[in-house]
Amino acid sequence: MAVEKVKTKSIAANREARHEYFVIEALECGISLVGTEVKSLREGKVNLKDSWVDVEDGELIVKGMHISPYDMGNIFNRDPVRPRKLLAHKKEIRHLAQQIKLQGYTLVPLSLYFKCGRVRMELGLCKRSEERR
């Protein structure tokens, strides 16, 4: 039997993050969204440029990510920049929280993509790169 390739479709990438930060560790996690947000993502209407991730009460929360309202969504549309919960294992969250607290690292969204029909986010545990002037 042949091994099936996992289909991934890129939605958005945070190119500035790779320029401004040095990525130490990358992590894939899911994201909790509502239906109209997913439809808007399929159209590619998302901006990761000014987003960051916080650890609050043992949960990963992405803030500052802008998902434009879906055109046909009317009353079901949500606030475009509302905080969204990321889905990861508790052990991974504890590890990331410890790295942020002890080392002073930052969690930054690197990319957003569909994997097997589900929205996934690639997070980067980053350290701000020094200016080279």
List each model region and its residues.
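Intrinsically disordered, Lys/Arg-rich N-terminal extensions and targeting peptides
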Residues: 1-34
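Helical mechanochemical/support elements of P-loop NTPase systems and associated helical scaffolds
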Residues: 19, 34-37, 89-92
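Extended, positively charged loop/linker patches that create polyanion-binding surfaces
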Residues: 41, 46-114
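Conserved small/polar residues in nucleotide/adenosyl-binding loops
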Residues: 131-132
